[in-house]
């Protein structure tokens, strides 16, 4: 009987940890999505930011990678924001004017 109780207790604890682990990961995903939406709202509604098409942003990103040692491109890359929505894979690229 002691073995049965131990096994039952162990399985209950494992099930609880499994449910807790799943719940924590979904909360993390929700928090990340909230952060992304807040970031998009901050930059999309700001008239000082210009949003680029995906192709324009790819070209800009490749220029930044090629000129890593250039201080001008470094300051440019710090002003560019790449926001990704992991659910529907849409992208927004915004750059400060």
UniProtKB/Swiss-Prot annotation:
Q: Where is a lipid covalently linked (N-palmitoyl cysteine)?
A: 22
* GO-annotated cellular components: plasma membrane
Coiled-coil regions in this chain? none
Any idea what this protein is called?
A: Uncharacterized lipoprotein BBF20
Could you say which protein family the record assigns here? To B.burgdorferi BBD15.
In its UniProt entry, the species of origin is given as Borreliella burgdorferi (strain ATCC 35210 / DSM 4680 / CIP 102532 / B31) (Borrelia burgdorferi)
Lipid-anchored residues (S-diacylglycerol cysteine)? 22
Q: Which residues form the signal peptide?
A: 1-21
State where it is primarily located.
membrane
Compartments reported by the entry: Cell membrane
**Disulfide-bond pairs as recorded:** none
Print the keywords alphabetically. Cell membrane, Lipoprotein, Membrane, Palmitate, Plasmid, Signal
For membrane topology, the record states: Lipid-anchor
Q: Which Pfam families match?
A: DUF5425
- Does Signal appear among the keywords? yes
Please, which domain of life does this record's source organism belong to?
Bacteria
